[in-house]
């Protein structure tokens, strides 16, 4: 089976990005490894099962990269955070100070609201109307 394991998100600062994604969005810090060049390999994940797509938080190194922080998709929603309990996660994120750009709405495809991360990248918080048809990750504890 093939899957997208990581997506790179260029950030201003490793530690402030880790704080936002773990504290405000409830992600887990999967890896934070120093590299010989002084950079770090930092991965956060929205799930604890290790089967989702992680975010590689890459600190901007030059002006070109700094210019992309917060605008990696040209102002479009570029990231989609699925939930199985929209009201719970919306309330938790609101309490954590996440900036929502609109009121929650109910569409034919599910409950959705656009929010932005600490740098301004746009995300959808989405509870699909129809459960995800993809098979669930294997239950490794049953082996």
Question: What are these model-derived regions, one by one?
Answer:
Residues 17-22, 93, 120:
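Conserved active-site tyrosine of GNAT-family acetyltransferases
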Residues 8, 22, 83:
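Ser/Thr-centric signal marking residues that sit
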Residues 11-14, 35-37:
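Conserved beta-strand-loop-alpha-helix junction that forms the acyl-donor binding cleft
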Residues 13-14, 84-86:
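Helix N-cap motif at beta-to-alpha junctions
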Residues 1-6, 28-82, 88-118, 126-143:
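Vicinal oxygen chelate
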Residues 13, 117-120:
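Conserved phosphate-binding and hydrolysis motifs of nucleotide-dependent enzymes
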């Amino acid at each position: 089976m093939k899957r997208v394991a990581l997506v790179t998100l260029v950030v201003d600062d490793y530690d402030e990005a880790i704080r936002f994604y773990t504290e405000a969005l409830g992600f887990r810090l999967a890896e934070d490894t120093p590299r010989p060049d002084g950079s770090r390999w930092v991965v956060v994940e929205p799930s604890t099962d290790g089967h989702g797509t992680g975010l590689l938080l890459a600190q901007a190194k030059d002006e070109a990269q700094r210019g992309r922080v917060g605008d990696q998709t040209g102002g479009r929603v570029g990231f989609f955070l699925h939930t199985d309990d929209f009201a719970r996660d919306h309330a938790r994120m609101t309490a954590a100070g996440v900036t929502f750009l609109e009121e929650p709405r109910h569409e034919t495809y599910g409950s959705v609201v656009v929010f932005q991360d600490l740098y301004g990248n746009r995300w959808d918080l989405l509870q699909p109307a129809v459960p995800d048809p993809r098979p669930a990750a294997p239950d490794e504890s049953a082996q």
